[in-house]
């Protein structure tokens, strides 16, 4: 086995371990968040947020651009390619947000849950916030630098969990969960641009 093959195998193994750890750490942090917020909020609050998340998830699946995958697989990656994908992702997220915003009223009527309307209006813009993040994490995946990617994802999750718990103590309703999701998107912007301007 050549030195390059051995180095690649080592990086793949480290990446697999880092991604496995990431999955477990984020799950543990998520369980901590749920365990605490469940004592402060009602099942109804979780239902409102869950409904809005399902709606957002469906729209995101329909509008997925796959730009990140393109950057990872491209052989000769230039800065212009990165800038183009970043711009396209942002431009695609804006009509998605506006569509969801305008459909929030009819969707809340269809779902027989009037509180969902205002929640959808806010979570609709989460993809826009996430699109403003630096493409650094995608470039880390391309370079197979999964250890650094692990720290980034854990930092964002940790900030989101702390924000959600604090908001649950203060607000005592479903808006704590909604704003917790927004805080995760904002944390992603701050953390990625702090390390990859």
Give each language-model segment a name.
Residues 1-31, 69, 76-87, 116, ...:
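N-terminal membrane topogenesis motif
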Residues 40-43, 79, 110-113, 143, ...:
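Helix-loop interface residues and adjacent transmembrane-helix termini in multi-pass membrane transporters
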Residues 118-120, 176-177:
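Short hydrophobic/alpha-helical segments at membrane-entry points of transmembrane helices
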Residues 62-79, 138-142:
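Helix-loop junctions and terminal segments of transmembrane helices
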Residues 8-67, 92-104, 121, 126, ...:
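Signature of the first transmembrane helix
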Residues 69-70, 97-110, 131-143:
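Transmembrane alpha-helix boundary signature
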Residues 1, 68, 135-142, 146-147, ...:
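C-terminal transmembrane helix end/exit motif
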Residues 83, 88, 92, 134-157:
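Substrate-agnostic recognition of the 12-TM MFS/MFS-like secondary transporter fold
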